[in-house]
Curated annotation (Swiss-Prot):
InterPro entries: Long_scorpion_toxin_alpha/beta
Keywords assigned: Disulfide bond, Ion channel impairing toxin, Neurotoxin, Potassium channel impairing toxin, Secreted, Signal, Toxin
Function, in words: Inhibits voltage-gated potassium channel.
Name this protein carries in UniProt: Potassium channel toxin Meg-beta-KTx1
Principal location class: secreted
One of the record's GO cellular component terms: extracellular region
Length: 91
């Protein structure tokens, strides 16, 4: 039952995030929907980690460049799931 709830919450968060809702909205939803305990802590941690990622980075080649040009007027590079402005990949 708890696994189904977690999957349902995750899919709901993914669907709502495409509508422009931010991490704080999801944290509030988790706070009221999930009882206090270990499960809530795990879900809140997952929401925070997902909120920090930029999924367009690996999926769309020019996402980071467009993102960094808008913000800092620098060239953008994809580092995993995060865009870094002006910091090239160092292998």
């Amino acid at each position: 039952m708890q696994r189904n709830l977690v999957v349902l919450l995750f899919l709901g968060m993914v669907a709502l995030s495409s509508c422009g809702l931010r991490e704080k909205h999801f944290q509030k939803l988790v706070k009221y929907a999930v009882p206090e305990g270990t499960l809530r802590t795990i879900i809140q941690t997952a929401v925070h980690k997902l909120g920090k990622t930029q999924f367009g980075c690996p999926a769309y080649q020019g996402y980071c460049d467009d993102h960094c040009q808008d913000i800092k007027k620098q060239e953008g590079f994809c580092h995993g799931f995060k865009c870094k402005c002006g910091i090239p990949m160092g292998f």
